[in-house]
Structure formats: structure tokens, C-alpha cells
């Protein structure tokens, strides 16, 4: 993170939920990438969103920070069950997941740890790690053309092709239809949970990644882990005007 207000707020938020921050790198050479959606309260008490405000780095990650990131990843690996990678910075090499770091992630995945990746524009460049694209990202990564939103069958085809490309499992999210789990041998559709009422899908992909990660590290198989990802996302999308979270009690409640 940068030595800025956004980095400070992020660290405070992590501490508040009990997350460790001792391995985080703080540097005055970078900004903390931040995506903000200002809200305006209407007369009826409802909130409406204004245009998004983004804070980004416009120059490549310094080499010394890359070196430290890679060193810390290697040290931390021994004490964790899995690694979740969120590569949301679109500008190449301007975020934490640079080309060098991505190569190191492939090595980590080859050491038997469960590594799960979500990447906004480079999902097809990862190797050995499991990846979690949506249907558009999966199709784009393997060069499959389509008109409009990909169908479930197109998502399956894209997922299988992407699994062969990255050399690992692919979890393709397909909106309200749930998820497709793919490997080189085929695809399994894991239906989503039906949700009624108003929803906000922003962050649903992050929620499903967290659900898959928690389930897989707890020993569930790939299909059951995908089902957990669907379940978590089905809860978080119902949180309007707030950060989408899904507690164990909330997950148990929707399963009753």
C-alpha cells in the first residue's frame, strides 16, 4: 500500500476484522489503488451512485518493491493453506501483480498449495493456478467470439479451453446461473441460489472467490467449493448501500 490516506484506511479496516497486516509493504513510491463510488442520499432516504472515482499508479512498480513482495510471498507460503490473488489493476506492471510476481505465483501453485486467481484483464496469462473469470473474461482469454452475453454452453467451452491454457481448474461465474467448474476433461455446472428482491452485484465475484477459497482450504472438493462460492455471493448481493459480507450465521440461515 502507499503511505496515503487510502492505505491507512485499508490497514485499519483489515485490523478491525482481525486480519494480519504485518506482512504488508508500505511505500511512499506508490499510491494505494482505490475505486470509489460516491453516494448521494435522495429525499426518500435511498442512495444513488455518482460516477466512480479511481486512484491508480501510472508508472511501473519499483523493482525493489517487487523483490520484497516475492521474498515475502515465499516466507508466508509455509504458514498458509492457500493463496488468493486479486489482480484488478488494468495497467500492466503498475500494481502488485506484475509480470515477475505472476511468474512467481505459478511456482507457488506448483508446490501443492491451492492458489486461486481473479484478474480483470490478464486471466489467460496465469499458469498452474486455478482461475476465476466471469464468462466474458474466459471467452476473451481464449479468443472465442460471441454475440451479446455468452450462453451457458459458450461459458463451458471457454472454461475448458482456458483450463487447458492455464494448466489448472477454472471456475467460470455465470451470473444468476451460478458457476461452471472446468478442467481439460470437461465442465460441471453448479447452479446458483435464487435471490429475490433488490440486489447489487458489485463485488459478487470477490465474494465467490472468498467462498471458494475458504471451502477449498477446509478440504471440500472443487464442485462443493464452487457451491460455497455461489452461496456466499447470493448473500452479499443483497447488501444494498454497504460492503457486501456473508457471516457464517447468514450462510447457515439461507441453507435452512
Label for each model-derived stretch:
Residues 213-217, 234:
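Regular secondary-structure segments
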Residues 1-199, 218-220, 226, 231, ...:
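Ribokinase/PfkB-type carbohydrate-kinase core domain
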Residues 194-212:
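Short glycine/threonine-rich catalytic loop with a Thr-x-Gly-x-Asp
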Amino acid at each position: 500500500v502507499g503511505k496515503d490516506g487510502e492505505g491507512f484506511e485499508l490497514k485499519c479496516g483489515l485490523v478491525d476484522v482481525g486480519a494480519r497486516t504485518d506482512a504488508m509493504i508500505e511505500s511512499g513510491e506508490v499510491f494505494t489503488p482505490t475505486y470509489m463510488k460516491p453516494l448521494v442520499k435522495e429525499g426518500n432516504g435511498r442512495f444513488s451512485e455518482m460516477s466512480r472515482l479511481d486512484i491508480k499508479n501510472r508508472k511501473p512498480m519499483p523493482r525493489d518493491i517487487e523483490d520484497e513482495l516475492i521474498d515475502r510471498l515465499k516466507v508466508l507460503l509455509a504458514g498458509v493453506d492457500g493463496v488468493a490473488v486479486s489482480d484488478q489493476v488494468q495497467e500492466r506492471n503498475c500494481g502488485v501483480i506484475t509480470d515477475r510476481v505472476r511468474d512467481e505465483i505459478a511456482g507457488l501453485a506448483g508446490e501443492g498449495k491451492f492458489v486461486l486467481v481473479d484478474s480483470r484483464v490478464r486471466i489467460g496469462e496465469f499458469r498452474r493456478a486455478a482461475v476465476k473469470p466471469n464468462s466474458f473474461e474466459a471467452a476473451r482469454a481464449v479468443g472465442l467470439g460471441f454475440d451479446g452475453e455468452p450462453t451457458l454452453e459458450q461459458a463451458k467451452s471457454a472454461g475448458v479451453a482456458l483450463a487447458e491454457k492455464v494448466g489448472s481448474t477454472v471456475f467460470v461465474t455465470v451470473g444468476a446461473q451460478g458457476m461452471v467448474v472446468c478442467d481439460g476433461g470437461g465442465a460441471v455446472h453448479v447452479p446458483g441460489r435464487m435471490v429475490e428482491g433488490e440486489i447489487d452485484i458489485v463485488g459478487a465475484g470477490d465474494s465467490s472467490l472468498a467462498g471458494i477459497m475458504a471451502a477449498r482450504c477446509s478440504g471440500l472438493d472443487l464442485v462443493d467449493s464452487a457451491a460455497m462460492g455461489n452461496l456466499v455471493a447470493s448473500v452479499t448481493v443483497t447488501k444494498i448501500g454497504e460492503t457486501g459480507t456473508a457471516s457464517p450465521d447468514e450462510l447457515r440461515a439461507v441453507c435452512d
